């Protein structure tokens, strides 16, 4: 790790820590402010009563209906894009199975892409379909997190908020203003924003090349701020139009972390104790630092088959190894999934770290909203285990944690392993799944594991060697994405409803403090143990075996 790489990391960390309380304070105000005149007029236009709050079940039904309509709308737009305007490249209809996979992918905040954006989607589909869903899926995740915060903040009530009010406030009051400013900065740095057709140019080698362009900047900002990750171009953030220089690369990474980190501060403020938010952020930071250090060290060792020289395969020279590895860890500890280097080209142990980041449940900052409520679910499990050790009924933020909450937490925690290992196991064993695996041996297993870890945890990044655009993978990965999204969200909302109905319990001498270092250590341990016990065998069979084979000079 050189001084330049350390400086990049320290600058990134300092900016994230500086933004966290500022954005956290603003979001606290946004979610608690009374309805204004302009806002009330907007609700009247849509037929929404902002004073009518919902119980957790009604909130969940609204969430599911909203996503169902979103999937149908995006599917239809893809199927009919050939007959619609803003299609200068003349893109035809997207095949049914690919359109279904893409609609599920963007509606669930996954943004897994079994296609090349510039060669498949029209400008209209990119803007009115994919970009719009980047806003809405991110807003839905934040809304669920806010509902959970209200569960802790309220007592003796059956309501957790109004889904339509929450998603409107997040979209109009938070995401749109930040994206407008951010997109203008990106345009100033050379990111295109136009409606032009692809241009044909003659390269330095004297051959012709078609260069796509379009409304890139507007999609790039929400792609990162909403931890969506789907690229306008097939190369994603490795493409110079998406990520032209080091400054834009830094802006992208800050946008990925900004809301997820700040929501911990909002959580502490709404719970009445800011230390609780810092404790959660501390646990996230510990896991992030460990992953970053391990990934950097593993990639810096170089390829042993080539005498240990630096591994520049799949990386952009303008960014280098340090910025590529920092981005790889940032994008996988969150549910973003954007990439500025090809993860399939990382050395085995370095490639394992992004995989592990996802397999831990995307709770290290995680997706906007989903990272917070995922870590809170682990916090509930932590205080439950701590309570068992001392023989007391566990409490968290003044609420007794009982059997119902723990059962719901376990359902939420087990949802993604079922999707990853269950459906991924089918892909490994069935001929339809094996047909898409390009690499032999342990790396082929890693490609499939990475794909379903990405889909099940709503990340969207990939080991590019897997041929995913088949009916089998389009269907199975869509199923994994839905399980990873909704079978986690619904139990979280049920937990919010159960907590909101409870009376607040004053802290006593026997209450386990959840704002100190001991709680942070226990929380990190629970996250690692659950992830390690669940996925350790398959990780050994994949990247660990590949590393040992590579060290012995065996290639696959």
Curated annotation (Swiss-Prot):
Q: One Pfam family, short name please?
A: KdpA
Subcellular locations according to the entry = Cell inner membrane
Question: Which InterPro entries does this UniProt record tie to the protein?
Answer: KdpA (IPR004623)
Bilayer disposition of the protein: Multi-pass membrane protein
Sorted alphabetically, the keyword list is: Cell inner membrane, Cell membrane, Ion transport, Membrane, Potassium, Potassium transport, Transmembrane, Transmembrane helix, Transport
Q: Which GO-annotated molecular functions does the record name?
A: P-type potassium transmembrane transporter activity; potassium ion binding
Q: Where are the transmembrane segments?
A: 3-23, 57-77, 129-149, 172-192, 247-267, 278-298, 319-339, 346-366, 371-391, 408-428, 486-506, 516-536
> Does the keyword Transport belong to this entry?
yes
Q: What is its main location?
A: membrane
Question: Which Gene Ontology cellular-component terms appear in the entry?
Answer: plasma membrane
Q: Which family does it belong to?
A: Belongs to the KdpA family.
Question: What is the annotated quaternary arrangement, including any partners?
Answer: The system is composed of three essential subunits: KdpA, KdpB and KdpC.
PANTHER family, per this entry?
A: POTASSIUM-TRANSPORTING ATPASE A CHAIN (PTHR30607), POTASSIUM-TRANSPORTING ATPASE POTASSIUM-BINDING SUBUNIT (PTHR30607:SF2)
Function description: Part of the high-affinity ATP-driven potassium transport (or Kdp) system, which catalyzes the hydrolysis of ATP coupled with the electrogenic transport of potassium into the cytoplasm. This subunit binds the periplasmic potassium ions and delivers the ions to the membrane domain of KdpB through an intramembrane tunnel.
Protein name per the record: Potassium-transporting ATPase potassium-binding subunit
Q: Which gene encodes it?
A: kdpA
